[in-house]
Design a protein with these regions (language model features):
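Flavin-dependent oxidoreductase catalytic cores
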Residues: 189-190, 197-200, 210-213, 300
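Iron-sulfur cluster-binding cysteine motifs and their immediate structural context
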Residues: 21-24, 200-224, 244-268
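Amphipathic alpha-helical scaffolding segments comprising HEAT/armadillo-like alpha-solenoid repeats
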Residues: 291-292, 320-333, 354-365
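Alpha-helix N-cap/helix-start positions at coil->helix boundaries
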Residues: 301-306, 336-339
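Auxiliary alpha/beta "docking" domains used to position bulky ligands
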Residues: 1-194, 233, 242, 370-372, ...
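A beta-strand-loop signature enriched in Asp, Gly, Thr, and Trp
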Residues: 222-242, 253-289
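Structural detector for internal amphipathic alpha-helices that build alpha-solenoid repeat scaffolds
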Residues: 308-320, 341-351
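Acidic, Ser/Thr- and Gly/Pro-rich intrinsically disordered linkers and low-complexity segments
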Residues: 290-302
Length: 381
């Protein structure tokens, strides 16, 4: 075989063809150098924007240089796997305070195993059909700056909400990587930023988690608060959470580029009607029900008690029958630890306060109408 075979565009074409056959929707190749992004990462960590996600601080040397993670790495093959589910009526659910909003990526199957399996198939095929080179696959499972690597590989550009954007898929996709010692040609097609002057993603954030464009303060991000955060959620952020009980999609839902996203892999379509569940219904799940209905689901990452803690806040922001909701909340008091109890008591107080305010408003409106009806007609004075 010609020694320059690996530099042929035909190799990339065959690689892309196989990737599409395996269900990936885009693929690109880049070198592993991410040095230009290291200072930004260090500043983000120094600002404390990572919250309790201490793993960002660990193995910082590996994030700076992927060749230390996998010695001998010459190229990073970055892949895209679209997940947009169909017909989820997400805006209607988000606007209904009595329904549970679960982030779109978490409505179906957890992507990690599926991504790794397909990447492994791709790597094995490459070694068998093209050339026997070493590789390792990653799916959000290693200290890699995967968004920056994907951007370098031509899969899109990083938007002001810090997510990777593609003209063909918006931001509704997962990323995976295959690190190899094969000196493949790098992708020569790169996306320039197409955000322009748009700030829709920054303006919509319920908790003001973006201190500036391209910067995310995770400690205020609802996705972080409902999945990674341990302990009570800060009280000032509970009401803005609304009915978002696992993740948040607001910054993606308003992004103009997401209008062009195609429906994703069927593996990520909703299971157990998670796209249309009332808050009270989910809060009533036993742990056995939770484990059964979230098998193979991203919801498992939060765990049963954390999920209840999030649901309690959602119920505190709900508008349905106050007494019924309070009774539902009280059914879990004293059973699953102090954080859940704190959230439940906050929710009950919020519901009672809102009920009192509504009663006062109704009484005031009634008195106003009564006074208007009793007032003499001007012609009778």
């Amino acid at each position: 075989m010609d020694a320059s075979w690996h530099q042929s565009d035909q190799v990339l074409d065959r690689l892309r063809e196989k990737a599409l056959e395996l269900g990936f929707t885009a693929i690109g190749v880049t070198d592993p150098d991410v040095s230009q992004h290291v200072s930004f990462l260090e500043h983000w960590l120094e600002s404390g924007f990572h919250g309790s996600m201490e793993w960002f601080e660990r193995h910082l040397d590996l994030r700076r240089d992927p060749t230390q993670l996998v010695p001998g790495t010459q190229r990073v093959i970055s892949v895209r796997l679209d997940y947009l589910p169909e017909n989820t009526d997400c805006i209607d659910i988000l606007n209904d305070p009595d329904m549970a909003y679960i982030s779109r990526y978490a409505l179906g199957r957890d992507y990690h195993k599926l991504m790794r399996k397909r990447l492994k198939h791709l790597g094995d095929w490459f070694s068998d059909e093209i050339a026997p080179h070493g590789f390792r696959v990653f799916s959000d499972s290693a200290p890699l700056l995967e968004k920056h690597l994907a951007e370098k590989a031509g899969l899109g550009w990083i938007g002001k909400h810090t997510l990777l954007l593609s003209r063909s898929a918006g931001s509704w996709f997962f990323l995976g990587e295959l690190l190899t010692d094969c000196p493949l040609p790098v992708s020569d097609e790169h996306e320039k930023s197409r955000c322009g002057s748009c700030t829709a993603c920054l303006d919509i954030c319920p908790t003001n988690a973006f201190p500036a464009p391209y910067q995310l303060d995770a400690t205020k991000c609802i996705s972080y608060l409902t999945i990674e955060h341990k302990g009570p959620i800060p009280e000032a952020l509970r009401a803005p959470m609304g009915n978002r009980v696992f993740g948040c999609d607001d910054c993606q839902l308003v992004c103009p580029w997401n209008r062009y996203a195609a429906i994703g892999d069927p593996a990520f379509h909703p299971r157990h009607a998670l796209d249309r569940q009332p808050l009270c219904e989910l809060f009533g799940w036993t742990e056995a029900e939770f484990l059964m209905k979230t098998e193979g689901s991203p919801l498992r990452r939060a765990g049963y008690v954390k999920f209840l803690e999030n649901l309690a806040i959602g119920l505190g922001n709900s508008h349905s029958d106050t007494e019924r909701v309070i009774q539902t909340l009280r059914s879990k008091l004293g059973q699953h630890g102090p954080t859940l109890d704190e959230h439940i008591l906050w929710a009950i107080a919020a519901l009672q306060r809102r009920a009192s305010e509504n009663a006062l408003d109704n009484a005031s409106a009634h008195q106003s109408n009564h006074a208007h009806q009793q007032a003499p007609d001007a012609g009778q004075i």
